[in-house]
Each structure stands twice: as C-alpha cells, then as structure tokens.
C-alpha cells in the first residue's frame, strides 16, 4: 500500500519562510471563495413571508392588527346605523341605499383599503400555484364583498351611500381570532388545551350568528316596522332561546326569509360545534386534562407513574398515603399511558377521592405530559413497575426509562422507584428510594424458614394501622393480635424525647429495657447525627448521645401521645377496667398495648399489687430454685456479655471428633467471591474452602465425585429447605445469603434444595457453588416423583415461589390458580409439611389450605368483610395462613415504598432486618423458642430483662401457636350437630363462664373450651341449612364423615408410598397423615410487659453483631477464602 504522506509533496522553502514571517496573512491573497448560505431567504417575497407568517412575534402583531381592524369596521357599521335617521316610506330603495356621512365614509374606505391590501398580500405570500384556491376561499370572498364597493365609491361618488354588509366582517374577525390564538401559543411557547380552543370557537360562532341576525333583520325592516338595534337584539335572543313571545316580529317577507335562513344556519353550525366540543370533552375526561399551574404552586402534590393502573394498586397507594395526618392536604396526580378502566373511574368518582386525586393519561417519557402533571413542582414522584407482565425484564426497562425521563425533566423532584429484577437496580441508583421486589421477596421467604412468619411481621410493621382491627371480635386472640398489629416504627431525637431523654449517657440495652418497662415502647435502633447508617441494636457497648436519633416500635409516635401520672390515671379510672379476665393487667401495660394516646408513667415507688412477680419457691423446694435475673446495667460490663443464645449454646460449633471425621468439607467465613448481579450488598457468610464442581450441585444426578441420586442418600443431619421456582433468577441468590450468614450457627444450617422448572444458568451456578449444602434439581411441584426425589418427605419447609409465566391472566385474580391448586395438592399429600407460598394477589390467600365446610374459616371471612367495611388497610390479617406466615404476596410490601415518603428510614430498617444489608455494629433478626425450662421467666418484661442483661438481645415480638383439638373431620360436621351443641351450651351458661380463660394462658387444657367458644361464634355468623332430628342421626353422620376422611387419607398415603417404592426410595419416616392437632398461630408485635409467656412461643430478637465484641474484628471481615489464612480467620471470628 502506498504511503499517504508520500503522495503530498512538501512546500518549497520560500513558502515556508514566508509563512513563518507573515503567519496567517500570507493566506489572504489566496484563491478562497466566500460562501453565503440560505440565499433563498434573502428574496423580497421570503422576507415578507418571514415577517407576516413565519416569525412568531411579528405574525402575532399582524393578526392582532387585522382582528382589531375587523372589529373597527363592525363598530363603524353600528355607528352608521345609530346615526341614521329613520326614513319614511317602504320603498325597496331603502334596502340598497343608506345615509352615510362623509367622515364616516372616509373611515370605512380607509379600513377597506387596508383590509383588502393585507388580504391580497397574504394571498400572494401563501400562493402555491393554484390561483383559484386563493380566490374561492370564503374569507377572501367576504373581504371582496365588504371592501371593493368602498374602493369603487372613491372613483364613483354616487355610490358613496350604497349599502355594504360590513357587519359580515364579524366572521372575518372570528377567523383572525383563531389564527391569533394559535400564534399566541407559539409566541409564548405554551399550548392551551384543544378544549379551550373549541370553547372559544363555539362562543365566537354564537356571537357572530347573533350579531349577523341583529344587523340583517334591522336592515331588512327598514321597509317595514323600522326596528332599531335593541329591538332586533331582543327578537334574536327570544327567537334563539325558543321562547318566542311574539311582541316583536318581522313584517316583510325578506326579513322573515332571512330569519328562517339564519335559523337553518344555526341548526347546522351549532350542532357541529357542540359535537366537536362533546368529543373533546370525552377525550379530556380520558386524558385527564392538565394539573393547574396555580394549584401546583400553592398546593402540594405527588405524582404516581404507572404503566397500567389496577384498582388494587390504586387503593393500596391511596389508603397508605392518606393514612398519615400531615398528607391529608396533598393532591395525587396519576400519570398513566392507558385509559382509565371502569373500576378505577368508579372509585375516582367517590367524593373522598375525586377532590384530591387527578388522573392524567400520558407518558412519563414525554416532556409535554410531565409538564401537564407539573412534575417540576411535585413533592415526590412514585414510579411503579407492572409486575403482572410475562416479560418482567421489559417492565423494568420501562421503569428505568421513566425514572431517567423524570430525573432529566425535574432533577430536584425526589424519586421513589419500584424495580422488579435486582440486576436492573444499579441503573436507578440516583433515585432517592428504591425497592427491589425480588430482593425483598426472597430474603423474606428465606427468613420465614428460620424465623417463622417473618413475612407477616414485616408486612404488619410497614402498614399504617391504629390497632383497632378485631376489637369487635368475641375471640381474645383476635383482639390481642389486632391490637398489636397497630405497632409501627417511629423516630425521634433523644434530647427531644420524653421516652428516652433520661437515658443519655446510658447503654443502648439499658435504654431499650427501661423504656419498654416504663412506657411500653421498644427501642430497636439508633443513628448518630453525623452518620447516615442506622444501627439495629448496637449492643450494650453503645452509649446514647443527646443528638442520637432513636428508632422505636409503638402504637403511635411520641408527638401524638399524652403522658399522665399513674396516680392521676388511677383516680380518673377507679371504676373502669380494660380487661376482665382472671389475670388482670396493670393499667399502664394495657394503655401501652391498646394504642391509646394516654401512656402511663409508672411510679416505681407505688407498684400495683396485682402486677406479675416471680413466685418464691417453697422452703422444701429451695434446691429447685431458678437463678434470678440480673439487672440491666447503665453501662454494661462487656466482659459478662454472652454472644450466644439465652437458652441453648449456639455460639459456634465445636464439633466432636466423630463429627469431624464424618465431615469432609471445612467451612470458612468470608464474603462470597462471586455475585450474580451488580449492586448486591456484600454479606459475611459461611463458605466452602473450595467451590463445589457444578456436577455436584445437581441433587438427583450422580457424578464422578458422589453417587447420590436423591436427598435421602445424602444423610443430612438437619431437615431440608426446598424452594420451588420457575427459573433460577438473580433474586434467588438473596434466598441463600440470609440462610448462610455468618451469624447463623453452623450446626443449624439447613440444606437448601432448589426445585427449578428450567435448568439454571452457568453464572448462577458460579454464585452458589461457594455455599455449603446448596443443591438444585430440575423438576416441578406438579410431579410427585420430583417432589419425592428432592426430599419433600423429610423437609422442614417447602417454599413455593410465584411463577412469572402465570402472573398475568385475562380474568382478575386467576393468575394464582395453578399455584393454589398445586399447593393444595401438597397440603393434602403431605399434611405435616410446612408450606410457605407466594401469591400474586393477596385476595387469593383465602384459598390456601381451603376447607369448603370449615365453619371457622367462614367466620373469619365474615370478619374480614366487616374489617374492610370499616376501612381497615389490614382486612386480610385474620386469615389463618397469613397470620401464621404460611402465605405472602409481594404486593403487600408496596406500602413500604409509599410509607418511605414520610418515614425515609423504613427501607433501610427493613433491609437490615431481612439481612439484605449488613452494617458493622448493626444487629440482625433471629428467634428463640420458649421451652418448659424457660417458663420460670413467666412474663415478657422479665424475658426482656433477662435478654438485655445476659446477651444484649432486644425482643420485638412473639410468634404464638395455640393448639386446636378440633380435627378436620369435626370441623365439617353437619349444621344440625352444631345447633345441638348450641342448645347444650345454653343449658349451662354458668358452667361455661366459669371455665372461660384468656387465650394467652399457658394451661393447655383451656384450648378445647376456647375452640368451642370459637365454633359458637362461627355458627352464629354462618348459620344455614336444614335441621335433623335426634342425637343418633348426628352421631352417625359424624362417624361416617370421620370414616370417609380416614379412608381418603389412607388412599393418599398408599399412593405416595407406592411411588416411593417405584423410585427405590425408603418409606421410613414418611408421615402417614394420621389425625394431627390443628394449630392457630399469630404474631404479637411489641406486646405489653405483663404478657405471659407460653410454651412453644417463638420470640423475635434483634441480636447485636457478634463481631462487634471482638477486639480485632475488622481483619476478620475481609474475604479470606482464597488464601492460606482461612483457618486462622475463622477461629478469630467465632461467635
């Protein structure tokens, strides 16, 4: 190839020397040509066109002048009519000739000359090759009719008094007005709605019709009654209003014919205008019009951007947003590209919402629509993804573009964004608050397996409630559960707080325990003034400062509370009692738990005699006396603080020699070396020394490293956690991480089996191959063989994740149909299996573990309807699967994003509780179970003290399970038996009252009576069906039903066993599904200090970071997997 540089010869030396001396001047005499652009605009015609048409401002001035000129001509016509003396006689000459003074004629001629010249000039400038198109236009014809006679009269004086219908210039004025409005919008760069233009055209058309009719009748009646302008106006108004009094009527046939013609014109023109106006009005109703600029500057509003608006999403947003008192005056502007559906339209017509919710149809990607919503003046913008889409990634991409568009248009508007896929989160890091659906969903489902009902706990915390749900119910558990559900997270500065001000300089655990003991509030976290990180239970080493921001759980925030001394409260409530059970609670405890604004300040010098105290052991039982509870120190002695569980040694696994020889894999602690997506928070975890080969991750396939083909062959010491999902998305990574976090005891790690419909990608396997005891298997919960191979018969929990391919359905709420039926099949086949299900729609949770003839479930359905009628945001909370944490819908967490508008810390606290974020010094959520050996503690307050003084843990709630000895078959007895029991109960009401006890009692013998009372209440709410006579018939019916149920269970058991034998699996340990006790589980968030502990209660704890107790904890936090010092690091970071 020829070198390009060699093709250009160098300059001679003299030119180079000249260039050195003269610089750029040496180029002045060269042959250069100056080129001028846009020469076509320099012609005379183009300059005129630029001035009269193209230039916005000059064109506006010309049209305004033209409009004024036409109005002036009409005004001169009126002046001529008023100055003219009525002529005598009825000759037709009066129609063609009028009396016009010379000055008036001169003015009209001048106006006509200017108008005609302007019309001809504009016609010339807009000429496009067809002269007839310009001549035959109606405005041009009217201009000729009104201007040419005056110009002719200049040269022919006898025509000066010729009648010219100058009043027709009103139509030219209307035409000029329309053009002027368009130019005005262009000049000020502001577009009015088409509705405004159409209304203006309609009004101007109506005025022109009336003015033309007035002037025409008045002129034609010059040969008749000689009406003046006022009489003509009166006649036109009466005629057009269809009243027609008949006192003023035209006499000549010409005027009558003119009236008929004008009425015909009106009947043609006005309906067309009204039709266009009605069409624009309907379109405006669909699109929503504009949000007023004046309102945007004087009132506060937020914008909700969604791709499609469903009624459930709308009501969740409105109920949660307007639940806060200070947001009552805010407007909500909804910006949605689709047309409003019928249900949404019906709701927005309710006066409560129509006054403060505005629906705009438009796209967030259009600046014009963002301007309509006044996004630059909005207090916040909520951007939600459409989760009911087959392609969720595409939905995320739309959300990302909306967020970018809003940030570009209004950079100062706070953004609250909901994203579906975690891999898309890093695109919107600039947003003020982001909730990633799959991150929260999988982390919550994972914690449900080790901390039961974590999903219910978080859902209740992020919903705004006053704790009034269930207070009308006759069942005590529903009252207590509903009352405690009103607890939320609030914040306050320590020095401004009555709750915590006295604990300045004290330890965190001391402040938390005494605040709960005194006020019933639970201090769970703190944040330094100069630090943005929130610390959950930083432990006893943390000393409270005056400027610290305290985060606490309570029924209401401190600012809305009033404080009364206990003596004053006792005097004002001598005859009042909040509770009439056997174990009466002190007033200060009940007020704190009931959620009233009056909170007792407990007087330590005057303690209620009925308050709970530890019973002293008898003299003969001193050898069995339990150790007393140590006091919580103001400044804790950290050398005495244990980093283990209260009741069992879970500190770290010192394995026995037998276990060491049987264990082939050594675990280390460190950060996972590979993350499946950008933006995942690093978490200190239990990891393997070396990653597992991909072939060994397959549970049901043997390889060269192991020969196991089913879960039973692995011989796991702990029960399995099975996750049934459609695909191994990146969000599934967040299910594994909380279960392998470093603070989980190694001995308690459960094997995780991923049952996937589709094989996982290689990058996902790269991420999970470092975690111990994580396997996958390709299969479906539709297939019994797949379930048996993955170890469902000895699994602790089965998590069924909602499938993306079924999230959208043509009929509302049918998206969960397949999931519900599959889970019901699992429930029938493996009744002892704990199944945790995710649904798309919360309304479908009523179908979980469905029993068609269960009266108690029917009664709960009635209760849910009543709570919804009372306006509760948590009407679904009394459904037994939700209360027990067996079912969850991610849409219930939408309120987390909405609540962040008022509580900007809620997302951070929720992420810390779920283990999605880990901050050095911040605690983590865990649980402990109350056994028989722990019942000596007796009350929640003493448990609080025991935990704070020994381990530094802070309890935040109780998961309570009550036994129900009514079997499934007994719940399906006939109505006649129920009514017979009703009659039996009525016969002995005194005995029934004497046996009634509180549901919080620890005596297990009370539960049958409680269940019997529940059945009575259920029968009252759902009584129906014919009566049967005789006790024998009822007993025979019940026996037949029990026999039918037993035979059905035996048939299912035989089916499962036969499949296991066919697959070569051992049937040992399979639950043959004998009658088992049904249970009722629910959560008590921040219960009162005097709540009695019961057997099998699970207490939610926020445990301090174990690494914060180590003197050299920072080096142990480094990733130490791929170096030789792993073992030393593991020893240093033991709990």
Swiss-Prot record:
Post-translational modification: Phosphorylated by protein kinase C. Phosphorylation of the C-terminal domain inhibits channel activity.
Protein name, per record: Potassium channel subfamily T member 2
The entry's keywords: Cell membrane, Ion channel, Ion transport, Membrane, Phosphoprotein, Potassium, Potassium channel, Potassium transport, Transmembrane, Transmembrane helix, Transport
SUBUNIT field: Homotetramer. Forms heteromeric channels with KCNT1. These heterodimer channels differ from the homomers in their unitary conductance, kinetic behavior, subcellular localization, and response to activation of protein kinase C.
Subcellular location(s) of the protein: Cell membrane
Any one GO biological process: potassium ion export across plasma membrane
Function according to Swiss-Prot or TrEMBL: Sodium-activated and chloride-activated potassium channel. Produces rapidly activating outward rectifier K(+) currents. Contributes to regulate neuronal excitability.
Extracellular side: 85-101, 159-164, 220-228, 250-256
Transmembrane segment boundaries: 64-84, 102-122, 138-158, 165-185, 199-219, 257-277
Gene3D superfamilies from the UniProt entry: 1.10.287.70, NAD(P)-binding Rossmann-like Domain
Domain RCK N-terminal span(s) in chain numbering: 299-435, 718-858
Reactions that this protein is recorded to catalyse: K(+)(in) = K(+)(out)
Coiled coil (UniProt feature): none
Activity regulation: Are normally in a closed state unless activated by an increase in intracellular Na(+) and Cl(-). Inhibited upon stimulation of G-protein coupled receptors, such as CHRM1 and GRM1. There is conflicting data about the effect of ATP on KNCT2 channels activity. Intracellular ATP was initially report to inhibit the channel activity. However, others studies conclude that KNCT2 channels are not inhibited by intracellular ATP.
Intramembrane segments: 229-249
Keyword match Membrane: yes
Membrane topology: Multi-pass membrane protein
Disordered, as annotated region: 982-1036, 1111-1135
Family under the similarity heading: Belongs to the potassium channel family. Calcium-activated (TC 1.A.1.3) subfamily. KCa4.2/KCNT2 sub-subfamily.
GO molecular function: chloride-activated potassium channel activity; intracellular sodium-activated potassium channel activity; potassium channel activity
A GO cellular component annotation in the UniProt record: plasma membrane
Topology, Cytoplasmic side: 1-63, 123-137, 186-198, 278-1135
Entry domain remark: The consensus ATP binding site (1025-GPKHSGKT-1032) seems to be non-functional.
Biased composition (Basic residues): 1010-1030
Major localization class: membrane
């Amino acid at each position: 190839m020829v070198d390009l540089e060699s093709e250009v010869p160098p300059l001679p030396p003299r030119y180079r020397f000249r260039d050195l001396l003269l610089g750029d001047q040496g180029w002045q005499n060269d042959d250069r040509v100056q080129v001028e652009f846009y020469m076509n605009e320099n012609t005379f015609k183009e300059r005129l066109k630029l001035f009269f048409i193209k230039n916005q401002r000059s064109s506006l001035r010309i049209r305004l002048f033209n409009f004024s000129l036409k109005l002036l001509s009409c005004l001169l016509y009126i002046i001529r009519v008023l100055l003219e003396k009525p002529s005598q006689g009825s000759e037709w000459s009066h129609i063609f000739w009028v009396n016009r003074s010379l000055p008036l004629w001169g003015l009209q001629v001048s106006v006509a000359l200017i108008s005609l010249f302007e019309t001809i000039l504009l016609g010339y400038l807009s000429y496009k090759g067809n002269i007839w198109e310009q001549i035959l236009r109606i405005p041009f014809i009217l201009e000729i009719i009104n201007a040419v006679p005056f110009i002719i009269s200049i040269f022919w004086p006898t025509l000066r008094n010729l009648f010219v219908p100058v009043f027709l210039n009103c139509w030219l004025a209307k035409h000029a007005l329309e053009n002027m409005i368009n130019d005005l919008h262009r000049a000020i760069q502001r577009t009015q709605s088409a509705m405004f233009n159409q209304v203006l055209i309609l009004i101007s058309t109506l005025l022109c019709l009336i003015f033309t009719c007035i002037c025409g009748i008045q002129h034609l009646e010059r040969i008749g009654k000689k009406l003046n302008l006022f009489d003509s106006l009166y006649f036109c108004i009466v005629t057009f209003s269809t009243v027609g009094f008949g006192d003023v009527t035209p006499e000549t046939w010409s005027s009558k014919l003119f009236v008929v013609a004008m009425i015909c014109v009106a009947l043609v023109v006005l309906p067309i205008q009204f039709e266009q106006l009605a069409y624009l009005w309907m379109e405006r109703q669909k699109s929503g019009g504009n949000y007023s600029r004046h309102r945007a500057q004087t009132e506060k509003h937020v914008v909700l951007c969604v791709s499609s608006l469903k009624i459930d999403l709308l009501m969740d947003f409105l109920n949660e947003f307007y639940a806060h008192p200070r947001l009552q005056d805010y407007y909500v502007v909804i910006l949605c590209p689709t047309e409003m559906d019928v249900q949404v339209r019906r709701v927005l017509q309710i006066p409560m919402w129509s006054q403060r919710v505005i629906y705009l149809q438009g796209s967030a990607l259009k600046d014009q629509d963002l301007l309509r919503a006044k996004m630059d003046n909005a207090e916040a913008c909520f951007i939600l993804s459409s989760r009911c889409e087959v392609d969720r990634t595409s939905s995320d991409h739309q959300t990302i573009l909306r967020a970018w568009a809003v940030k570009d248009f209004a950079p100062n508007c706070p953004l609250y964004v909901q994203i579906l896929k975690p891999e898309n989160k890093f695109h919107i890091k600039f947003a003020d608050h982001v909730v990633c659906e799959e991150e929260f969903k999988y982390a919550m489902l994972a914690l449900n397996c080790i901390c039961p009902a974590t999903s219910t706990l978080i859902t209740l915390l992020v919903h705004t409630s006053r704790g009034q749900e269930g207070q009308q119910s006759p069942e005590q558990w529903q009252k207590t559960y509903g009352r405690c559900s009103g607890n939320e997270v609030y914040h306050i500065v320590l020095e401004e707080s009555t709750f915590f001000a006295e604990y300045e300089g004290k330890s965190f655990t001391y402040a938390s325990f005494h605040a709960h003991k005194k006020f019933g509030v639970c201090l769970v976290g703190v944040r330094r003034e100069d630090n943005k990180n929130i610390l959950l239970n930083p432990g006893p080493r943390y000393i409270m400062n005056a400027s610290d921001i305290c985060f606490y759980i309570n029924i209401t925030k401190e600012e809305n509370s009033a404080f009364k001394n206990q003596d004053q409260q006792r005097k004002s409530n001598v005859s009042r009692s909040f509770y009439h059970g056997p174990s009466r609670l002190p007033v200060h405890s009940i007020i704190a738990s009931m959620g009233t604004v009056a909170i007792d300040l407990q007087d330590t010098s005057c303690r209620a005699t009925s308050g709970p105290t530890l019973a002293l052991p008898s003299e003969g039982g001193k050898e069995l006396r339990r150790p007393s509870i140590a006091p919580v120190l103001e400044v804790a002695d950290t050398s005495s603080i244990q980093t283990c569980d209260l009741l069992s040694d879970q500190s770290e696994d010192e394995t026995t020699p037998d276990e060491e020889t049987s264990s082939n894999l050594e675990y280390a602690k460190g950060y996972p070396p590979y993350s499946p997506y950008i933006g995942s928070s690093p978490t200190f975890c239990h990891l393997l020394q070396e990653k597992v080969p991909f072939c060994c991750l397959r549970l049901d396939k043997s390889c060269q490293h192991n020969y196991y083909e089913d879960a039973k062959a692995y011989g796991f010491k702990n029960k399995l956690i099975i996750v049934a999902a459609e695909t191994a998305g990146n969000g599934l990574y967040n299910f594994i991480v909380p279960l392998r976090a470093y603070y989980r005891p190694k001995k308690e790690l459960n094997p995780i089996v991923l049952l996937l419909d589709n094989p996982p990608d290689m990058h996902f396997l790269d991420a999970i191959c470092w975690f111990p005891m994580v396997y996958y298997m390709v299969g479906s919960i539709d297939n019994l063989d797949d379930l048996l191979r993955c170890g469902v018969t000895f699994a602790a929990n089965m998590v069924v994740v909602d499938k993306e391919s079924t999230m959208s359905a043509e009929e509302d709420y049918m998206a969960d149909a397949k999931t519900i039926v599959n889970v019901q099949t699992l429930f029938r086949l493996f009744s002892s299996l704990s199944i945790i299900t995710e649904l798309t729609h919360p309304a479908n949770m009523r179908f979980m573990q469905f029993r068609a003839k269960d009266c108690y479930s029917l009664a709960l359905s009635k209760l849910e309807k009543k709570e919804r009628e009372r306006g509760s945001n948590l009407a679904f909370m009394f459904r037994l699967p939700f209360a027990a944490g067996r079912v969850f819908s991610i849409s219930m967490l939408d309120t987390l994003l909405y609540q962040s508008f008022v509580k900007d810390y809620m997302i951070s606290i929720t992420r810390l509780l779920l283990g999605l974020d880990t901050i050095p010094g911040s605690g983590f959520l865990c649980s402990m179970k109350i056994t028989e050996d722990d019942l000596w503690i007796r009350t929640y307050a003493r448990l609080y003290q025991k935990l704070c003084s020994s381990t530094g843990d802070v309890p935040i709630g109780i998961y309570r399970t009550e036994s129900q000895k009514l079997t499934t078959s007994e719940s399906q007895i006939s109505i006649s038996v129920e009514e017979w029991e009703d009659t039996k109960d009525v016969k002995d009401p005194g005995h029934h009252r004497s046996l009634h006890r509180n549901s919080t009692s620890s005596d297990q013998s009370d539960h049958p009576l409680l269940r019997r009372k529940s059945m009575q209440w259920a029968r009252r709410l759902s009584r129906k069906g014919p009566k049967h006579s005789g006790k024998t018939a009822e007993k025979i019916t019940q026996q037949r039903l029990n026999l039918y149920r037993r035979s059905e269970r035996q048939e299912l058991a035989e089916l499962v066993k036969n499949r296991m034998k066919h697959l070569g699996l051992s049937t040992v340990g399979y639950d043959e599904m004998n009658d088992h006790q049904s249970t009722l589980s629910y959560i008590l968030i921040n219960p009162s200090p005097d709540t009695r502990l019961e057997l099998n209660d699970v207490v939610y704890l926020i445990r301090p970071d174990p690494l914060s107790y180590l003197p050299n904890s920072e080096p142990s936090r480094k990733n130490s997997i791929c170096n030789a010092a792993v073992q030393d690091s593991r020893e240093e970071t033991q709990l």
